[in-house]
Amino acid sequence: MHLSLTPQWSSWTVLLLLVSNLLLWENTASAMRAKRLNVHDYTTFGNTWNQAIQLSQSMNHRISELSTHFKVFYAQGRGFEKRTTRCHTSSLSSPENKEQAQKIQLEVLLGLAHSLLQAWVNPLYHLWAEMCERLGSTPPILSKALEVKTLNRNLLETIEKIAFKGNFEINENGNYTAWSELELLQSPNRDTRYFAFHNLFHCLKKDSSHVEMYLKLLKCRLIQSNC
């Protein structure tokens, strides 16, 4: 009887040992990553990353809603998509995809995300006011524009928290052309004015999408270590 039970007990023992070793390895890996990042509370650090990504996703969702609204009510049939657009952040040379971003050092990529958001502080300050004045946007649409402005500011602050907790140094890259489209947004010529809004939404959507991609990739590289 003892002999017949030995294989069963042996298999359970092996399984328990495997599970125990897996948990031990995960805890050790987390501790090693926390030590490497000089992070005392690794869980809180991860939660801050999640908060940043959620803010970025919410911001992208609102930008998409504003962009779609503008296309439907103001840009249809004007051929704006055939015109050349140029963004004031183009000189930052942002990676366009995950493969390019993987080649960038962690601190540099985090600093780039911060720089992109910082570059939009002034344009977003004017966006909702000009949408009200020049487009006659309704309060629900204006509230979304104001929400994008707030989300951008909150995301900047969250990235700064990440840098502080992770002992990163954000080197602010101000190597971008100052935004100078306000006069075009206020142009008395309707086609000029509408194209300026089209260009703004195009660039804002592109840069904001890049920020979300960078944050997800950085979290993966720092916390999951399997990208």
UniProtKB/Swiss-Prot annotation:
Region forming the signal peptide: 1-31
Glycosylation sites: 175
Entry's localization field: Secreted
Keyword Secreted in annotation: yes
GO molecular function, one term: hormone activity
Keyword Metal-binding included in the entry's annotation: no
Classification via InterPro entries: 4_helix_cytokine-like_core, Somatotropin/Prolactin, Somatotropin_CS
Top-level taxon: Eukaryota
Family: Belongs to the somatotropin/prolactin family.
Name by which UniProt lists this protein: Prolactin-4A1
Organism: Mus musculus
Gene name of the encoded protein: Prl4a1
